[in-house]
Amino acid sequence: MYQLQFINLVYDTTKLTHLEQTNINLFIGNWSNHQLQKSICIRHGDDTSHNQYHILFIDTAHQRIKFSSIDNEEIIYILDYDDTQHILMQTSSKQGIGTSRPIVYERLV
């Protein structure tokens, strides 16, 4: 059975450059890792009070974003854009103690 995680990125588009918005949009969509039976749904919006995450850092040069849950800021998530079909996701603690191995996700069509 697949584990499904929803990620609702909450941010103010008026405070971002066009390049930063484009970088975020690379990650919007549905992604899956069939081997680990994990899926994630990444979207923009605060239309729900659940699974809300705020963006901490946008690295447009490396197509990477860092974000954390509004409810638990101790865990930091890092998304790296690999290509149009793949992203990498890893977690780290706010104190910088340890980082998980990246998990590769494939875009679901």
From Swiss-Prot:
Localization of this protein: Cytoplasm
Identify one Gene Ontology CC term for this UniProt entry: cytoplasm
Asked whether the UniProt record includes Cytoplasm among its keywords, one would answer: yes
Please give the function described in this protein's UniProt entry: Specifically inhibits the cysteine protease staphopain B (SspB) by blocking the active site of the enzyme. Probably required to protect cytoplasmic proteins from being degraded by prematurely activated/folded prostaphopain B. Also involved in growth capacity, viability and bacterial morphology.
Q: What else is known?
A: Inactivated by staphylococcal serine protease (SspA).
How is the subunit organization of this protein annotated in UniProt?
A: Forms a stable non-covalent complex with prematurely activated/folded SspB.
Listed GO molecular functions? cysteine-type endopeptidase inhibitor activity
Would the keyword Phosphoprotein turn up in this protein's UniProt record? Answer: no
Q: Which family does it belong to?
A: Belongs to the protease inhibitor I57 (SspC) family.
Q: What is this protein called?
A: Staphostatin B
Write down the species.
Answer: Staphylococcus aureus (strain NCTC 8325 / PS 47)
**Region feature (Binds to staphopain B):** 97-101
Gene3D superfamilies in the cross-refs: beta-Barrel protease inhibitors
Induction record? Expression occurs in a growth-phase-dependent manner with optimal expression at post-exponential phase. Up-regulated by Agr (accessory gene regulator) and repressed by SarA (staphylococcal accessory regulator) and sigmaB factor.
User: What is the predominant subcellular site recorded for this chain?
Assistant: cytoplasm
Please indicate which superkingdom the organism of origin belongs to.
Bacteria
InterPro entries xref list: Protease_inh_b-brl_dom, Staphostatin_A/B, Staphostatin_B
Supply the alphabetized keyword list: Cytoplasm, Protease inhibitor, Thiol protease inhibitor, Virulence
